[in-house]
Amino acid sequence: MKGFQLIATGGALPGRTVTNEELSRTVDTSDAWITSRTRARHWCTEEESAATLAIAAAKQALQRSGLAPADIACCVCATLSAPDATPSVACQVQAALGLPENRPALDVNAACSGFLYGT
């Protein structure tokens, strides 16, 4: 593999939207303070995890790219929120998308800089 190309992106949000009112009841703050800084936030439901969200986003990116699963040379997932130590999120994405098993799949655990390290 010689470098990489970012051809398409995908995205996924957790199913539970946490309102500012709901959050202000659990911490000592106000809706106005939260809105000025973060607006809405989304939390995973019991059925969701970093892996399920990564799979949904990767499926969307693959569809948008026009590539076949066999065209993908490597699967890299950057997360600090893996639901399990093993299998890695990348291996779960690889399996769910039908990517070739003889290609690398790895997680990058580098917090906020994960995207930079992963690319």
Predicted region positions:
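Conserved catalytic cysteine-centered active-site region
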Residues: W33-R37, R41-T52, T79-T119
